[in-house]
Amino acid sequence: AFSVFFFEPKTIQSIFLRSKPLYTNSTINRPQNASIITVALGLYFLIQLVLPLRHYFIEDDVLWTEEGHRLSWRMMLRTRSGTASFKVIDKTNNAVIPIDLNQYLTTKQKHNVTTKPDFMWQFAQFLKQEFATKNKDVEIYVTAYVGINGRPLRPFVDSSVDLAAEPWRLFKHSRWLLPSK
């Protein structure tokens, strides 16, 4: 395997790279777009480094809030259990519309919606769109309790916040999540 280093470049060229001409100039020509490639690769590697570490820049405990947990360098050595109920209120007449999660979600989806904040928010947005197709403007409130690693369930979401009106903050802490302590 190391014998390649003892042959002349012309010999290696004639054996392995017959169709490619041998480059014999003493100077190496730098491509015109080398700086663009360097910047692009630098940004790519920066993203690959920062994305898994973003949970250090988001306030509160990532184990509790789940913010910044996915695609991070953390081990999933925890289990979450919880319950959640969604209350939909029609803005025109303040009528409460009951939501049965079984009508909308599978068992696995229901587990995710009741324990993970991004799923709760997405389901609230889905319900908002569902009622918008029926020409109803609604507010959606969630009462959720979550327990981690077999601990007792604790309040997880501020039930006075309308999740239908909340924006999703990808790299920031969501105000509607209650603190871990």
Where do the PLM segments sit?
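Hydrophobic alpha-helical transmembrane segments in integral membrane proteins
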Residues: 46-71
